[in-house]
Amino acid sequence: ATGAMRLAIEIVDSRLPHGSGALAELADGFNNGALVCGPAVAQWQSLAFGQIGIRLHASRGGESSSSELALGSGAAILDGDPFGTVVMLANVPSEPGIGLRAGQIVTTGSCTGAPALPGPGFYRAEFAGLGSVSVRFVA
């Protein structure tokens, strides 16, 4: 069972050179450098995940002036439904002692792609009707 759904920003990063191949990416955690988790979403069970719009904003100066870095929606996720990927993962047969366990965090993939960040600054992802999550990178 899913305990909660949270808004999040996944930071893509790799210890390996670009083009190292699928097995190397698997060994490197699928290029997951960090996960910035925001607030839990109330009443998430009734949401149409594929219809939720997401805007990623970047600000190099102050938080008040920003530009849109990327635009997407939950439809960009496998089969157009981010929660569907969680169900698919939960239904994959696994060896005893391996598989999903209570308390684990599952990311479903990017709704906005993986845009290159212009450098240090304030970044905010807005999830239509649900709220936002933000992160600040410093030099």
What are these regions (language model features)?
Residues 1-81, 86, 95, 132-139:
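Catalytic-core "active-site belt" of small-molecule-metabolizing enzymes
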Residues 28-41, 105-124:
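A broadly tuned preference for mixed-charge, low-complexity surface segments
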Residues 85-118:
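A conserved acidic, glycine/proline-rich C-terminal tail/linker
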Residues 115-139:
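Charged, cofactor-coupling segments
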